Structure formats: C-alpha cells, structure tokens
Amino acid sequence: MSEEAVALVVDNGSGMVKSGLAGDDAPKCVFPSIVGRPKMPNIMIGMEQKECYVGDEAQNKRGILTLKYPIEHGIVTNWDDMEKIWHHTFYNELRVSPEEHPVLLTEAPLNPKTNREKMTQIMFETFDVPAMYVSIQAILSLYASGRTTGIVLDSGDGVSHTVPIYEGYVLPHAINRIDMAGRDLTYHMMKWFTERGHTFTTTAEREIVRDIKEKLCYIAMDYDEELKRSEEHSDEIEEIYELPDGNLITVGSERFRCPEALFNPTLIGRECPGLHITAYQSIMKCDIDIRKELYNNIVLSGGTTMYNNIGERLTKEMTNLAPSSMKIKVIAPPERKYSVWIGGSILSSLSTFQQMWITKEEYEDSGPSIVHRKCF
C-alpha cells in the first residue's frame, strides 16, 4: 500500500450507502442500499436486461422490480446482495479499484461479531483491499461535530443507538441500542394509509411512503395538544402530496403521529423505551462525575433525526428526566444526515490513524477475527 493511496470511506447504512474519498467534506455518492430484481421475464429480446439492479437504478425502475434491503436493523442479512452493493459502490459510483485503496467501513454498536468478521473477509478476499478498518457509527459522528466528549444519539433507517464518549474514550457498558428507526416508521405509515383506503403494499410503494414521511412529517412539541389541534383545525395541519400516478393524497395527523413513535414506541406497538429515555439510561450508566458534561453535549446524528423540532422536543423531554439544576444542551448539526461519513473522512485522513489499519498481511496471519482486536 503506497503512502499516497487515498482511503475510501463507505458508510453502509440500512437505508442509504454514503461513500467517498477520505479528506473530502461530503460524501461523493449517496444511494439507497437496495437490490432490485425483475418480477417478470423480459420479452423485448433486443433490450439488455440485467438480473439485478442496485441503488438509484433500482429506485428508478422500481415499478417492475422487487426491491430488497440487504441490511436489516444494521445487520447484513444477505451477503450476496451486500457484495453487489459494494461492487456498485467501488466500480460504478466511486470508479476506483478497491485493491489500490484502504477502506474504512462503519457499523452499528452491539452488532453480532460474525457480521464484522464477514465484512472483513469479503473486503480482503473478494475485493482484495490492501487495508481496512471497521468503526462504530456514533464515534464518527462525534468526530464530525469536533468534540471528544458527549453522548451521540444516532438514529438511521435500521437502528437507533446512544453512545456516551468521554475524552475520546467510548464507555461500552453504557451503550444502548434500540432496533427501531426510520424503516419502522415507514412501515407504520403504510398501515395508516391502508386504513384510510390508500393501499401501499409493494416494495416500490413502500419507497413512496418513505418519501411522504421525509417530506411532510414533523415532531410535535406537545403530542396531546397537537392531536387536539388536528381534530379542531385539521386544515392547519393537512398537506397534499401528489403520487406518481397523479392522484392526490391528503396527509393529516399522520404528519406528527408517525415520528412521535420515536418518543413513544408503544404507538407502533413496540416495547422499547423512547429515544429520550434511552439517552437518559445511557447517561445514568456512566460515572456520576461525567454525567454533567454528557447532559451538556447531546449530539444528534443520522437521517431519522432530521425532523423539524426534534432538538427542541428532546431538550424538553431530557429536562423533565434530568435533575432540575442540570443544563441540557442538544446539538443538532445541519449536516447530521451525513455526519457519520464526515467523521470517517476526518478519521481516515489523520496521520496518527495510519497505524490503526488492518493490513492484508495481518489478515492473512490471523484470519477475520483480527477485526475484534484492531477495531473497537
């Protein structure tokens, strides 16, 4: 591996793949982590037809494809499809040969150990990379915000987790993870629309609902008040969304009922604590001396934290939980959708990080289990 080789940073989210070159300030390409396969055989003989499509191409042809996400709740469930996504990332999107660049991958905390071993194996054996590293997503988000102490609340498409970090040290005993995130909200929104007579059932229609959710949903400062307002003055809350076939759909109280599940998961029938309680429990598992600094540095990251009012609502909920004299500060950086990737870009271009890479020689000596020794 030459000194000049720029590292590739690939943030494999459950919903989106963010990838680019180390040292850049934003990911070069962002595409959905989807693999689509045609539902029907092709009869137009002259037309070139692939057996599968990846990313944006799958998204554009979604009407004739069955779409599958290879990553569910942050864990890779289909390795063949995952390889296709990585292949697409390196050769079609970034247009680089992976055998010439070290690769930094990201992972959710508390993932099964076999998941990162298999990632390591595929990188070295299939893509022949000279070196690689696997980093925890939340730690990278903290790097991106320019802090060394804080509690990161990362919520993406598949996993939400809270990770307290003090002076650069992760406190693994205090990490909390809930397998409820953006995708669960999308599924629930589909159910609500079905109750109102709009059927969204296919995998392609699920993507339409995801778009409605991203464009129209917001978080209510006071859920009960907002419900009352939506019943009395529904016109203030309703928004019109145009479906791809030209039909119009009115989205009313779903706009705030859907993301409310982040704070009250029982709304969608989940038995896990809300985001604010998860963060509070994480802080309470930490040493009493550092709690004050953690309350003061609650950093949001991930696409599911992009809803309007989320920072204010989280501040309000945390203030109710914390001791009354405690100052609560929630930091919601505008680029938080990509902060994991940005942190990876910063980390992999540091000169001090260069000895951290798992090299090909080390992999050949020790096998995939080296990833547990070299990466946190």
From Swiss-Prot:
GO biological process: symbiont-mediated actin polymerization-dependent cell-to-cell migration in host
GO cellular component: actin filament; cytoplasm
Activity control mechanisms: ATP hydrolysis occurs in the polymeric state. Unlike for mammalian actin, ATP hydrolysis also occurs in the monomeric form and the release of inorganic phosphate (Pi) is more efficient.
GO molecular function annotations of the record: ATP binding; hydrolase activity; structural constituent of cytoskeleton
SMART domains: ACTIN
EC numbers for this chain: 3.6.4.-
Any Pfam family hit: Actin
Localization annotation: Cytoplasm; Cytoplasm, Cytoskeleton
Binding, ATP: S14, G15, M16, K18, D157, G158, V159, K213, G303
Keywords: ATP-binding, Cytoplasm, Cytoskeleton, Hydrolase, Methylation, Nucleotide-binding
SUPFAM superfamilies reported for this sequence: Actin-like ATPase domain
Catalytic activity, reaction form: ATP + H2O = ADP + phosphate + H(+)
GTP-binding recorded as keyword: no
UniProt keyword Hydrolase present: yes
Tele-methylhistidine modified-residue sites: H73
Superkingdom, natural source: Eukaryota
Remarks, miscellaneous: ACT1 and ACT2 differ in their polymerization, filament stability and helical structure. Unlike mammalian actin, Apicomplexa actins do not form long and stable filaments.
Role: Actin is a highly conserved protein that polymerizes to produce filaments that form cross-linked networks in the cytoplasm. Polymerizes into longer and more stable actin filaments compared to ACT1/actin-1. Has ATPase activity. ATP hydrolysis leads to the formation of a stable intermediate ADP-inorganic phosphate (Pi) actin, which is followed by the release of Pi. ATP hydrolysis affects filament stability; ADP-bound actin depolymerizes much faster than ATP- or ADP-Pi-bound actin.
Subunit structure: Monomer (G-actin). Oligomer (F-actin). Polymerization of globular actin (G-actin) leads to a structural filament (F-actin) in the form of a two-stranded helix. Unlike for mammalian monomeric actin, monomeric actin is able to induce oligomerization with ATP or ADP. Mg(2+), which is used to coordinate ATP, is required for polymerization.
Xref: PANTHER family: ACTIN
Family of the protein in this entry: Belongs to the actin family.
Name the UniProt record assigns to this protein: Actin-2
Species whose genome carries this gene: Plasmodium falciparum (isolate NF54)
Gene name in the database record: ACT2
